[in-house]
Amino acid sequence: MNKQPALAQEQYACVYAWLALLFFREVDDEGLIQLQSAEIADWLALLKRQPALAASVALLEQKIAALSLRQDAQLELAADFCGLFLMTDKKSALPYASQYPQQEPGMIKHLLLEAGMEVNDDFKEPTDHLAIYLELLSHLHFSLGESFQQRRMNKLRQKTLSSLLEWLPEFTNNCFKHDSYGFYAALSQLLLAIVRFDDGKEDLSIVAAE
């Protein structure tokens, strides 16, 4: 049986950047059109070739297809985003590492410093936001294409993945518990599967949709 080749560094980088944007801000009208575009369908088809990602991609594809049947889909997605990621009650899935006891405080700041990165002043969220981890991973995968940095950047990539995996499973579980429509639950499941795949733990079980 032929094994499907792993994703290229540039492909990882682009996927992480895309996911960072979706977890950072609400989907606007333009973003909704992009989600339903042939370009995104092609990207998901590429990811789906990896057996470890296939089930998560299929679930997200179902949720994207269902958007066309959802009245006021953009407004409803915005409400889902707000309820999950911006509220502070027990029915939310806050995207901050500091909200999860498994995570060492300030870890992301150390990782960014090692990577020579700074958070843009326009970024108004706390530094430990999920989107920052994903932007860092995107940067590191692009940097892995430069041979003189490969060893250092790969070591930092592993540290970032390990740090993220300390709390990402609980974040994903919270998304499944509290996202009644399921788009962000499916998105978080795909993210978890990709991070595990990137970390070499693609054989671990993913969160099952209820």
Swiss-Prot record:
Belongs to the TorD/DmsD family. TorD subfamily. Gene3D superfamilies: 1.20.120.1820, HscB, C-terminal domain (1.20.1280.20). PANTHER family: CHAPERONE PROTEIN TORD, CHAPERONE PROTEIN YCDY. SUPFAM superfamilies: TorD-like. Keywords: Chaperone, Cytoplasm. Its main location: cytoplasm. GO terms for cellular component: cytoplasm. NCBIfam families: PRK04976.1 (NF003442). Pfam families: Nitrate_red_del. The keyword Glycoprotein does not apply. HAMAP family: TorD. Involved in the biogenesis of TorA. Acts on TorA before the insertion of the molybdenum cofactor and, as a result, probably favors a conformation of the apoenzyme that is competent for acquiring the cofactor. Coiled coil: none annotated. The keyword Chaperone applies. It is found in: Cytoplasm. It comes from Salmonella schwarzengrund (strain CVM19633). GO terms for biological process: protein complex oligomerization; protein folding. Disulfide bonds: none annotated. This is Chaperone protein TorD.
